[in-house]
Each structure stands twice: as structure tokens, then as C-alpha cells.
């Protein structure tokens, strides 16, 4: 089984959290709402990987002004690729609290949509299991 270390930002701006609706045909949680993030590359520090993933997935204009390590955990997930193949992966999550100075997001093909969601609205979305656990552990759900 392959192992991946995943950096995961909890991005907040003026009391709202950035969530991404995953593409319906790929990923670990197809079609569900999730935090952004992705795998570390060899030679990267945690923060370098986090900032790269934010740029790749959410665009160059989202200005992250603060990054603070928050938690880590692991689990085993099945990832679905765009061609329909699947793979079981041991995932190690490094989760960070992040503040953004703006909401200027340009998302890539990994996502169907993005939303800035208040704490009160988190429970109205179809959050994936990992994101729901994260927000529950933070006391937001």
C-alpha cells in the first residue's frame, strides 16, 4: 500500500471557511465538500508544500497571511482516478490553521465549486468524513 503525507489548510477569512466541492469523477471523496490540500513532494518543508498546494488548487491571488500547525492524523482511503481506476492509500494528514487577507480564488479541475462557509452553515453541506471530523475536533460542528 502506498503512503502519502497530505498537507491540509483550514483557510479562514472574516469568520468564513473555504471549502471545495470535489470533482465527481476522481479523488478520495468524489462529489463531496472538503478542505483543499494535497501531497508533499520530496525535498519540501511542510509549509512549502502547503503554500504550493494552495497556489496550485486555489490560484495565485489568494493571499495567505498566517499559517499555524494545528493537528495531524492518519487513515486508509481509496482514491479514484479520472480513468476510473482505484488505489488504496495510507494517508498521513498535516492540518494547518490559515488566515487569508482576501477571498480571491481561482480553483482548478479537481473541484466543481468553492464556497466560503460560516460556522453556522457547515452542517448544511455534504462534508466528506475527514472534513467533518476536522471541524468536529475544532469544535465547529
Swiss-Prot record:
Limits of the Nudix hydrolase domain: 1-141
Signal sequence annotation: none
Cofactor entry: Mg(2+)
Motif Nudix box, residue numbers: 38-59
Enzyme Commission code: 3.6.1.9, 3.6.1.12, 3.6.1.-, 3.6.1.23
Gene name in the database record: nudI
Function description: Catalyzes the hydrolysis of nucleoside triphosphates, with a preference for pyrimidine deoxynucleoside triphosphates (dUTP, dTTP and dCTP).
Superkingdom, natural source: Bacteria
Family according to the record: Belongs to the Nudix hydrolase family. NudI subfamily.
PANTHER family, per database record: GDP-MANNOSE MANNOSYL HYDROLASE, MUTT_NUDIX FAMILY PROTEIN
Higher taxonomy: Bacteria, Pseudomonadati, Pseudomonadota, Gammaproteobacteria, Enterobacterales
Record GO terms (molecular function): dCTP diphosphatase activity; dTTP diphosphatase activity; dUTP diphosphatase activity; magnesium ion binding
Matching InterPro entries: Nucleoside_triphosphatase_NudI, Nudix_hydrolase, NUDIX_hydrolase-like_dom_sf, NUDIX_hydrolase_CS, NUDIX_hydrolase_dom
SUPFAM superfamilies listed in its UniProt record: Nudix
Annotated catalysed reactions: a ribonucleoside 5'-triphosphate + H2O = a ribonucleoside 5'-phosphate + diphosphate + H(+); a 2'-deoxyribonucleoside 5'-triphosphate + H2O = a 2'-deoxyribonucleoside 5'-phosphate + diphosphate + H(+); dUTP + H2O = dUMP + diphosphate + H(+); dTTP + H2O = dTMP + diphosphate + H(+)
The name this protein goes by in its record: Nucleoside triphosphatase NudI
Enzyme class of the recorded protein, top EC level: hydrolase
Disulfide-linked positions: none
Annotated keywords: Hydrolase, Magnesium
Quaternary structure and interacting proteins, as annotated: Monomer.
Amino acid at each position: 500500500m502506498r503512503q502519502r503525507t497530505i498537507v491540509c489548510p483550514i483557510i479562514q477569512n472574516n469568520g468564513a471557511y473555504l471549502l471545495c466541492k470535489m470533482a465527481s469523477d476522481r479523488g478520495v471523496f468524489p462529489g463531496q465538500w472538503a478542505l483543499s490540500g494535497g501531497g508533499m513532494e520530496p525535498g519540501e518543508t511542510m509549509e512549502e508544500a502547503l503554500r504550493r498546494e494552495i497556489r496550485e488548487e486555489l490560484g495565485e491571488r489568494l493571499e495567505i497571511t498566517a499559517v499555524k500547525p494545528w493537528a495531524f492524523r492518519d487513515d486508509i482511503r481509496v482514491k479514484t482516478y479520472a480513468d476510473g481506476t482505484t488505489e488504496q492509500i495510507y494517508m498521513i494528514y498535516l492540518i494547518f490553521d490559515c488566515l487569508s487577507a482576501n477571498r480571491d480564488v481561482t480553483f482548478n479541475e479537481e473541484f466543481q465549486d468553492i464556497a466560503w462557509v460560516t460556522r453556522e452553515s457547515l452542517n448544511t453541506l455534504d462534508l466528506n468524513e475527514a472534513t467533518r471530523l476536522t471541524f468536529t475536533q475544532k469544535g465547529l460542528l
